Amino acid sequence: MEIENSAFQFLTRETAAKFFAECDFTLKQGRHIQQYGADSKLFDYLYDNYEDLAKYYESLFGVYLRKENNEREEYFYLDFPQDGHGRFVKDRYKELDPRHVIFGILLLNVYKERMFEKKEMKWENLEQLFDESESRELWQKLLYGEVKRNYTPNEKDEVKRRAEHTLNLFDKLGWIQWIDPSNIHFEIMPSIDRIAKLYANEIANVELMSEYVHEQAL
């Protein structure tokens, strides 16, 4: 059956020629698309063609195109059936290990605390959370493995290295956007809210996460 007579006639539109391929690739890479920066054109395409695209992904790939919002900021992403499998589409969120999840929970907390403020963060802001926040002992235990008055330069460098690795992954997922990677300067995006949905049990029992991390590391 020719595409003009199919359920996917939207693929013949001029906008599909401009944006569909990039949008499709980006979604299948696990990215959350928001009206921000270079993703704005993809967001507009998804917004205008949401119903058609949702049918397309469910029919052909067995996955679901979701539209959600956080603080009235909308974002799009591909979701998977409960068995975690789609046809020819990899579940990128399964790449997250416990340390990624811990850092994601930290950023989610920061996002919520800064509800009416800019969500920009620098490394010194994160260090301040580790050292001075009300939850500092929890974060120190989760990130360093134990609570101490002082940490060695090597210990701090290792936490920073892991943080950079995690932030690079979160940038690919669309959960943060780099402003200046060389100085660990970034903005937390509305889609960080996905952490709350993917890892609700871990967030509810965050004080047990350190045990989980160390068990996985053995």
Where in the sequence are the language-model features?
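Short amphipathic alpha-helical interaction segments
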Residues: 45-53, 154-172
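Low-complexity, serine/threonine/proline-enriched polar segments
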Residues: 11-18, 122-131, 161-166, 170
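Short acidic, hydrophobic short linear motifs in intrinsically disordered regions
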Residues: 30-36, 117-131, 137-155
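Short, amphipathic alpha-helical interaction segments positioned at domain boundaries
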Residues: 91, 192-218
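Minor-groove-contacting beta-hairpin "wing" of winged helix-turn-helix DNA-binding domains
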Residues: 72-78, 183-190
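A short, conserved structural fragment
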Residues: 54, 58-68, 166-181
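Positively charged, polyanion-binding regions of nucleic-acid-associated proteins
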Residues: 90, 94-120
